[in-house]
């Protein structure tokens, strides 16, 4: 049995109740969300991964959406990899760096449309960083976190 308490600091994915029903015994926090870690029998989990099928709740792999007339400009400012040839529907693995060039995240960026990019982030507050950079540059963009729940097989 897993006891978690509702809070705005740690969210649950749309699959949380199903993972608990399937026997979740341990969890951690990742991207301010519950990340299932164990179902109580590591050997059985290993066999499911190597000999069968395992379904994982990875709703904690969040997106940061950058949308607006300056979305492409902000996306390019955030990462040193050239995105000028990133077509709609195309994704690229990119480092995201701070002002000193230190890598602060390594997401996959997807160009959703001409004025929208999604950064599929690792465990960090990249949305805050992107919002700050957009504000300091006076860019016409909105930085949000779209509600996307994902599960992997």
List each language-model region with its residue ranges:
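Acidic, proline/glycine-enriched N-terminal capping motif
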Residues: 1-97, 102
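Acidic, low-complexity central loop/insert segments
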Residues: 105-150
């Amino acid at each position: 049995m897993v006891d978690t308490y509702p809070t705005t600091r740690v969210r649950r994915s749309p699959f949380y109740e199903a993972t608990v029903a399937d026997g979740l015994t341990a969890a951690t926090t990742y991207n301010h969300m519950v990340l299932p870690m164990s179902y109580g029998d590591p050997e059985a989990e290993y066999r499911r991964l190597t000999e069968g099928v395992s379904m994982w709740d990875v709703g904690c792999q969040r997106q940061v959406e950058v949308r607006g007339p300056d979305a492409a400009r902000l996306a390019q400012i955030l990462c040193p990899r050239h995105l000028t040839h990133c077509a709609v529907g195309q994704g690229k693995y990119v480092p995201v760096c701070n002002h000193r060039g230190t890598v602060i995240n390594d997401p996959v960026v997807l160009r959703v449309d001409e004025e929208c990019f999604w950064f599929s982030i690792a465990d960090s507050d990249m949305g805050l960083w992107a919002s700050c950079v957009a504000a300091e540059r006076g860019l016409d963009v909105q930085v949000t976190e779209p509600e996307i729940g994902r599960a992997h097989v």
